[in-house]
C-alpha cells in the first residue's frame, strides 16, 4: 500500500523507483491504488502518468496500480474506520480492541484529544483521502431514529437551529434529548462528529464514498494498460468495507459498454495479471488446469452491489463481517475440472480435500510472458 508513503515525497520516490533498474533487478510491484477521489477531481490522472513513467524505456519498470471496480464506499462505527488512521488523534482509538468501548471513551474524554481531533479535521493542507464534507457522510444506524438515513450535514443544521432557540427543530423527545446534550454553541463541524463518537461509539454506524463515483472515469482507469483491476480489500476489514464482488463488477462495467469490452475484461482479470506475476494460469491452453467460472449475464446486468451488502456472523472470526451476496450471478465454479459450486450450494469436496494448486512463478512459458 502506498497511502502512507505519500506523506513523505522522498520515500514516495524511492519506493516507486525500486520497480525499475536504477536499484538493480526491478521489483515487480502492484501498488494500491489508482482512485478518482470524490474531493479531489484531478488526482486520478496522476496514477496512469506515474505508472507510464515507471514502465517507460527510461526506467524499465515492472509496475502497475490496482483499481477498485466500484464506488469506494466505506463504513464507520463511531471512529472505528481505516480512514481515521490518517489522523494522529484517532489512531489512538484504532489501537484499542474493537470491543473495548470504555478505553475509547477514556481517550475521547480528554481535552487534549478533542483539541487535536478538531484541529486535524479542519486542517485544509493535510494530505488525506477523507472527504470531510458533512453532507457526504450518511448515517445508517443510530439510537436517534430520526437521524437514520440522514447526513451529518442535516443533523448539524438541525442542531444549529435548535441551539438558536428553535426547540421545534426536535422531532421527538429522543431527538430533543440528543440535541440538548451537545456543547452549546457547537462551534466547528468537527465538534459534531467528536460529540457523536463520544456519546454513541459503535452504536453510530455511518458511511461515505471515498472515490470512484464517476462511471466514465472509473472505466478509463479499469482498462488503462498500466493499471489492473484489483484492490478488493475486504479480507483485511471486518465491518468497514466489502468488495468481494469486485471482479464481477469489472465485468459489469464492461458489459455496459459492449461484448468486446467484456472479452477484454476477462483478459484483464485472468491472463494479464498472470503474465505480470509470472504464474502459469489465466490462459485457454490445451492441457491447462480447467479453472472455470460461469456467470449469468442477465443476472450480472441487474446486480446492485450496494443493495447486496450484508452483515453476517462468521464463526471463523467469532464476529460479524460485512460481506457481499451476489446470489444468482455466478451459476457454477470448477477447480481443475471439478464442480465446487452449482449456483446454490458448495460441493462437499470443497475445503475437505485438495482441489487446486499453489500458483508459483518460474515455468519457462511464464518467464517468457513476464519478461
Regions found by a protein language model. Give the residues of each.
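Polyanionic/metal-chelating signatures
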Residues: 3-232
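Flexible loop/turn segments at secondary-structure boundaries
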Residues: 5-9, 35-43, 70-77, 236-240, ...
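C-terminal cap of metal-dependent C-N hydrolases
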Residues: 219-227, 294-351
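Generic beta-strand/beta-sheet core signal
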Residues: 30-32, 65-70, 230-233, 287, ...
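C-terminal helical cap
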Residues: 173-219, 250-300
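Feature captures the catalytic cores and cofactor-binding loops of soluble hydro-lyases/lyases
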Residues: 240, 244, 248-257, 266-268, ...
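Intein/HINT protein-splicing elements and their conserved insertion hotspots or analogous self-processing inserts
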Residues: 342-371
Amino acid at each position: 500500500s502506498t497511502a502512507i508513503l505519500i506523506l513523505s515525497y522522498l520515500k514516495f520516490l524511492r519506493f516507486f523507483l525500486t520497480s525499475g533498474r536504477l536499484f538493480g533487478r526491478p521489483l515487480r510491484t502492484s501498488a494500491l491504488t489508482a482512485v478518482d477521489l470524490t474531493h479531489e477531481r484531478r488526482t486520478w490522472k496522476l496514477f496512469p502518468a506515474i505508472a507510464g513513467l515507471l514502465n517507460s524505456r527510461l526506467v524499465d519498470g515492472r509496475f502497475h496500480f490496482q483499481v477498485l471496480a466500484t464506488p469506494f464506499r466505506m463504513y464507520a462505527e463511531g471512529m472505528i474506520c481505516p480512514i481515521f488512521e490518517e489522523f494522529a488523534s484517532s489512531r489512538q482509538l484504532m489501537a484499542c480492541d474493537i470491543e473495548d468501548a470504555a478505553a475509547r471513551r477514556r481517550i475521547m474524554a480528554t481535552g487534549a484529544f478533542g483539541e487535536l481531533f478538531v484541529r486535524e479535521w479542519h486542517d485544509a493542507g493535510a494530505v488525506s483521502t477523507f472527504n470531510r464534507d458533512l453532507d457526504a457522510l450518511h448515517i445508517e444506524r443510530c439510537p436517534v431514529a430520526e437521524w437514520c438515513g440522514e447526513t451529518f450535514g442535516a443533523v448539524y443544521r438541525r442542531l444549529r437551529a435548535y441551539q438558536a432557540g428553535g426547540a421545534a427543530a426536535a422531532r421527538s423527545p429522543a431527538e430533543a434529548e440528543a440535541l440538548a446534550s451537545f456543547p452549546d454553541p457547537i462551534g466547528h463541524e468537527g465538534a459534531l462528529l467528536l460529540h457523536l463518537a463520544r456519546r454513541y461509539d459503535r452504536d453510530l454506524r455511518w458511511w461515505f464514498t471515498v472515490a470512484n463515483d464517476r462511471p466514465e472515469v472509473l472505466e478509463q482507469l479499469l482498462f488503462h494498460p498500466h493499471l489492473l483491476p484489483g484492490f478488493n480489500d475486504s479480507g483485511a476489514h471486518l465491518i468497514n468495507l466489502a468488495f468481494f464482488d469486485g471482479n464481477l463488477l469489472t465485468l459489469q462495467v464492461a458489459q455496459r459498454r459492449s461484448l468486446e469490452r467484456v472479452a477484454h475484461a476477462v483478459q484483464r482479470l485472468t491472463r494479464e495479471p498472470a503474465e505480470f506475476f509470472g504464474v502459469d494460469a489465466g490462459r485457454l491452453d490445451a492441457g491447462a488446469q480447467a479453472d472455470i467460472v460461469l456467470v449469468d449475464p442477465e443476472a450480472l446486468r441487474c446486480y446492485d452491489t450496494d443493495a447486496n451488502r450484508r452483515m453476517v456472523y462468521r464463526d471463523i472470526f467469532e464476529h460479524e463481517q460485512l460481506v457481499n451476496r451476489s446470489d444468482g450471478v455466478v451459476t457454477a465454479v470448477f477447480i481443475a475440472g471439478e464442480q465446487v459450486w452449482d449456483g446454490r450450494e458448495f460441493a462437499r469436496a470443497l475445503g475437505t480435500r485438495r482441489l487446486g494448486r499453489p500458483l508459483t512463478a518460474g515455468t519457462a512459458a511464464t518467464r517468457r510472458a513476464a519478461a
